[in-house]
C-alpha cells in the first residue's frame, strides 16, 4: 500500500500546532460557544401557571353540565365521581384523551390527592377548593429520585439510582392502589356481615321448621293410634253381636236416669203434665234381645197430681209439722221387667213428707200411722185405685168434719188419674182391709159415705163406656166392696 507522505506530514504538523496554541483559526473552530441563560420573565410566567392536569380536572368538576357524573362535595373541599363507568366513557376522553379510570386515579395520587370516603370515589387536596382556582399552583407534582450527574462515572451509583427510582414508582403505585384495595376489603367485610346475618336467620328458620315437623309427627302418631282404636272397636262390635246391644242398653239406661232426674224438677209445672207422661216411654232392649215398651207407673202419676194440688189443701200442713211422730217418704220404683213385680220399700218412721210444699195453718197436727203397721203393698195392688172425686159440695157435711169448701175449687179435688188396668191382687188387699178401722183418723178430705158412693158410681159409669165389659164388671165389683167398707168405717166414726 502506497501512502502519500506529503499529505501525511502536513496533517501531523497541523495537529501539533492546534495543541500548542500556535494557530488561532483552528483553535477558535475547536472551542464550543458558552450556553445561554433563560430570560427571567419567561421563568416567572412558567411558575405562575398550574399544571394542565389540575386545570382540566378543576374545569371538569366546575362544569354544571357534568354534575350528574362528577361534582363538588357538600363541603366544597373535595369532588365526587358519582358514576365511574360513565365518567370513563364520556369525560376522560374529552379532557384527558384516554378512558382509563385507574390512570386518572394514579395521576391524582401523584399530585397528593387522597380518598376521603371508602364507600365512594371522593378525592380531596388542600389546594383543590371550589372557587379558589389560584390555589392550584401550590399543588406540586411528586418527583422521583434519579442520579444523572454521576451515572456515567460510577456504575454502582447508577444501579442504586435506578433501584431508588423503581422503589419510588412502586410506592406510588402501591399508594394509588391502596384506595381500591381498602375499599374492596371494606366491601367484602360488609358483604360478609350480611351473609352471616342471613345465615343466622336461615338457621333459625331451619330450627323452627324442625320443631314444627316434630309436632306434626306427634300429631300423626296420635291420629294413627286413634285410627287403630276405632278399627279395633269396629272389629269387636262386628265379631260380638251382643256388644252393640249392650252398648245401646247402657246409653238408654243413662238417658232414662237423666229423664227421671228431670222429672223431679218439673213437678210444679202444670203445663208439662202431659209431656212428663210421654217422656217416660223409652225403648229398652231386654235381656232376651227383644224390645219392650216401658210404661209410666200409675202410682207415680197419681202422686204427682196430688202434689200439684197441694197448694189447694192447707190442711195438709200438719204432715210437715215438727211435732209429728212419724211419716212416709215415697221413693221411685224401678220399672218392672220380665213380668216380675217389685215391692215398695218401707221407709223408717223418722222420715216425714217434708218435701211437699205447704202453707202454715192453725189446724192441729195429724198423726200418721207407722209404716211398719201397714202391710207391704205391691205396685199391682195400687194400680186399681179409683179415679172418682171424693167430695160433693151438694151434700151436707156432718158437724164432726171440717167443711172442705175453703180448700177446694168447685167442691172437688182436682186429681187426674189415668185409666188403671185390673189387678188380681186387689182381692187380697180387700180381704185385709179391716185393719184400717182402728187407724183411720177423722179427716175432712173424704167427706161422708154418701158423697163417696155417689162420686164413685158416676165415675164407674164413665169408665164402663170406655173399657171392655169384663174389666168394667170386675172393677165395679171391687169398687162396690171398697165403697161398702168405707161406708161402714164412716158410719161407725159418726156414731
Curated annotation (Swiss-Prot):
Q: Nucleotide-binding among the record's keywords?
A: no
List locations, semicolon-separated.
Answer: Cytoplasm; Nucleus
Please note every region of biased composition (Low complexity): 146-164, 454-473
Its cellular-component GO annotations read:
cytoplasm; nucleus
Q: Which Gene3D superfamilies match?
A: Winged helix-like DNA-binding domain superfamily/Winged helix DNA-binding domain
Motif mapping: Nuclear localization signal: 262-268
Ribonucleoprotein recorded as keyword: no
The protein's PTM annotation reads:
Exhibits temperature-dependent phosphorylation. Phosphorylated by CRK1.
What keywords were assigned to this record?
A: Activator, Cytoplasm, DNA-binding, Nucleus, Phosphoprotein, Stress response, Transcription, Transcription regulation
Give the UniProt tissue specificity note.
Constitutively expressed.
Segment Hydrophobic repeat HR-A/B: which positions? 172-238
Q: What induces it?
A: By heat stress.
Per UniProt, the short sequence motif AHA occupies residue numbers 433-442
The Gene Ontology terms for molecular function here are: DNA binding; DNA-binding transcription factor activity; sequence-specific DNA binding
Region annotation Disordered: where it falls in the sequence: 140-164, 255-288, 445-477
Which residue intervals are annotated with compositional bias (Polar residues) in the record? 272-281
Q: Name one GO biological process term.
A: response to heat
Give the family per the record: Belongs to the HSF family. Class A subfamily.
Task: Tell me, in a sentence or two, what this protein's role is.
Answer: Transcriptional activator that specifically binds DNA sequence 5'-AGAAnnTTCT-3' known as heat shock promoter elements (HSE).
Q: What assembly does the database describe for this protein?
A: Homotrimer. Interacts with HSP70-1 and HSP70-4. Binds to CRK1. Binds to HSBP.
Share the domain note from the entry. Answer: The hydrophobic-rich region (HR-A/B) corresponds to the oligomerization domain. AHA motif is a transcriptional activator element.
UniProt name for this protein: Heat stress transcription factor A-1a
* UniProt organism field: Arabidopsis thaliana
Amino acid at each position: 500500500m502506497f501512502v502519500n507522505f506529503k499529505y501525511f506530514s502536513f496533517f501531523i504538523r497541523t495537529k501539533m500546532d492546534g495543541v500548542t496554541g500556535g494557530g488561532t483559526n483552528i483553535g477558535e473552530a475547536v472551542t464550543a460557544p458558552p450556553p445561554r441563560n433563560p430570560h427571567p420573565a419567561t421563568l416567572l410566567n412558567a411558575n405562575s401557571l398550574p399544571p394542565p392536569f389540575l386545570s382540566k380536572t378543576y374545569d371538569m368538576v366546575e362544569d354544571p353540565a357534568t354534575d350528574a357524573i362528577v361534582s363538588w362535595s357538600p363541603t366544597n373541599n373535595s369532588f365526587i365521581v358519582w358514576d365511574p363507568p360513565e365518567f370513563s366513557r364520556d369525560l376522560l376522553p374529552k379532557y384527558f384523551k384516554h378512558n382509563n379510570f385507574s390512570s386518572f386515579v394514579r395521576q391524582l395520587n401523584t399530585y397528593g390527592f387522597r380518598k376521603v370516603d371508602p364507600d365512594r370515589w371522593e378525592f380531596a387536596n388542600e389546594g383543590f377548593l371550589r372557587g379558589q382556582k389560584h390555589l392550584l399552583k401550590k399543588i406540586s407534582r411528586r418527583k422521583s429520585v434519579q442520579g444523572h450527574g454521576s451515572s456515567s462515572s460510577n456504575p454502582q451509583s447508577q444501579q442504586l439510582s435506578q433501584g431508588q427510582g423503581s422503589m419510588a414508582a412502586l410506592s406510588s403505585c402501591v399508594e394509588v392502589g391502596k384506595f381500591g384495595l381498602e375499599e374492596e376489603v371494606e366491601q367484602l367485610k360488609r358483604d360478609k356481615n350480611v351473609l352471616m346475618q342471613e345465615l343466622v336467620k336461615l338457621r333459625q328458620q331451619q330450627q323452627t321448621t324442625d320443631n314444627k315437623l316434630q309436632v306434626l309427627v306427634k300429631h300423626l302418631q296420635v291420629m294413627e293410634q286413634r285410627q287403630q282404636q276405632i278399627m279395633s272397636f269396629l272389629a269387636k262390635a262386628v265379631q260380638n253381636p251382643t256388644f252393640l246391644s249392650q252398648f245401646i242398653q247402657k246409653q238408654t239406661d243413662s238417658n232414662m236416669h237423666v229423664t227421671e232426674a228431670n222429672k223431679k224438677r218439673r213437678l210444679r209445672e202444670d203445663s208439662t203434665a202431659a209431656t212428663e207422661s210421654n217422656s217416660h216411654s223409652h225403648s229398652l232392649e231386654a235381656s232376651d234381645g227383644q224390645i219392650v215398651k216401658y210404661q209410666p207407673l200409675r202410682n207415680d202419676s197419681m202422686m204427682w197430681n196430688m202434689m200439684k194440688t197441694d197448694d189447694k189443701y192447707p190442711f195438709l200442713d200438719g204432715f210437715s209439722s215438727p211435732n209429728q211422730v212419724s211419716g212416709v217418704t215415697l221413693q221411685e220404683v224401678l220399672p218392672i221387667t220380665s213380668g216380675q213385680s217389685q215391692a215398695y220399700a218401707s221407709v223408717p218412721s223418722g222420715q216425714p213428707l217434708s218435701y211437699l210444699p205447704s202453707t202454715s195453718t192453725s189446724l192441729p197436727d195429724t198423726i200418721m200411722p207407722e209404716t211398719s203397721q201397714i202391710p207391704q203393698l205391691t205396685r199391682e195392688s195400687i194400680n186399681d185405685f179409683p179415679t172418682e172425686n171424693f167430695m160433693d159440695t151438694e151434700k151436707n157435711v156432718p158437724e164432726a168434719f171440717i167443711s172442705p169448701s175453703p180448700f177446694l175449687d168447685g167442691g172437688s179435688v182436682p186429681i187426674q188419674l189415668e185409666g188403671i188396668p185390673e189387678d188380681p191382687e186387689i182381692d187380697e188387699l180387700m180381704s185385709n182391709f179391716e185393719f184400717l178401722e182402728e187407724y183411720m183418723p177423722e179427716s175432712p178430705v173424704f167427706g161422708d159415705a154418701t158423697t163417696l158412693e155417689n162420686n164413685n158410681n158416676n165415675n164407674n159409669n164413665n169408665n164402663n163406656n170406655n173399657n171392655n165389659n169384663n174389666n168394667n164388671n170386675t172393677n165395679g165389683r171391687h169398687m162396690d166392696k171398697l165403697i161398702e167398707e168405707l161406708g161402714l168405717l164412716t158410719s161407725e166414726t159418726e156414731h
